[in-house]
A protein has these predicted regions:
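Primary detection of the long, small/polar-rich alpha-helical "axial" segments characteristic
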Residues: 1-224
Length: 226
């Protein structure tokens, strides 16, 4: 008894085997090129859930890193404005010391007071116009930075209002007594700004550490073999 094989069936079997072999080869090449064992759900239906979780974690970390970088830029903007105010206060202190001398005439003191008034206005202008991302920086509100991939990974940044009035700068230099009183007020304002700049510097350092930690977490997750 002889066995007869239909030519069409033989060709079909051969083509299917060739397609399967080609598909396996393509999958192997894809794994080599991507360095990943799982590139699609069919590669490992159970393992794909782990891949999705890891990818979500990495993408969340990437977003958190951008948020932290934005926070760093916000702090830089704030500190730049405080530095300007600090310079203005030092100039105001010079004017006040000059006005304390009785060698000044009444007109001299009026001229000194006029410059002082303009500097007070400039401090208020800086406080009201400094912004980041279209939002005011010195608004007295609490700003939240999402610095991690999970709920609760937030950093609170407490803002404050900044103006000549909030710094207590409301004295004139039309008399020696006024100038003498104002010197103490200005020194207090300078100390206030120094403390705010110190806090900004500490926050900037913390954000640096946060960004470094996020980068390390991303690298560690990327090394997980999937």
């Amino acid at each position: 008894m002889s066995l007869t094989i239909n030519n069409d069936s033989a060709i079909g079997f051969a083509l299917n085997a060739l397609r399967r072999s080609s598909s396996l080869m393509n999958e192997a090449m894809e794994r080599l090129s991507t360095g990943k064992r799982i590139n699609r759900a069919s590669d490992d239906p159970a393992g794909i859930h782990r891949v999705i979780r890891l990818n979500a974690e990495i993408r969340g970390i990437n977003t958190a890193s951008r948020n932290a970088a934005d926070g760093q830029s916000l702090v830089d903007t704030l500190d730049t404005s405080l530095s300007e105010v600090q310079s203005i206060l030092l100039r105001m202190r010079e004017l006040t010391i000059q006005a304390m001398s009785d060698t000044n005439s009444a007109d001299d003191r009026l001229a000194l007071d006029s410059e002082l008034s303009q500097l007070e206005l400039e401090i208020t202008r800086i406080g009201s116009t400094t912004s980041f991302g279209g939002k005011p920086v010195f608004d007295g509100n609490t700003h939240y930075l999402q610095i991690g991939p999970r709920s609760g990974n937030t950093l609170e940044v407490q803002s404050y209002t900044l103006s000549a009035a909030t710094l207590g700068l409301n004295q004139d230099l039309t008399s020696r007594g006024n100038a003498e009183n104002y010197l103490g007020i200005i020194d207090t304002a300078i100390q206030n700004i120094n403390e705010k700049r110190g806090a900004a510097g500490a926050l900037s350092n913390r954000l640096d550490f946060i960004m470094s930690s996020l980068d390390n977490s991303k690298v560690n997750l990327s090394l997980i073999h999937i």
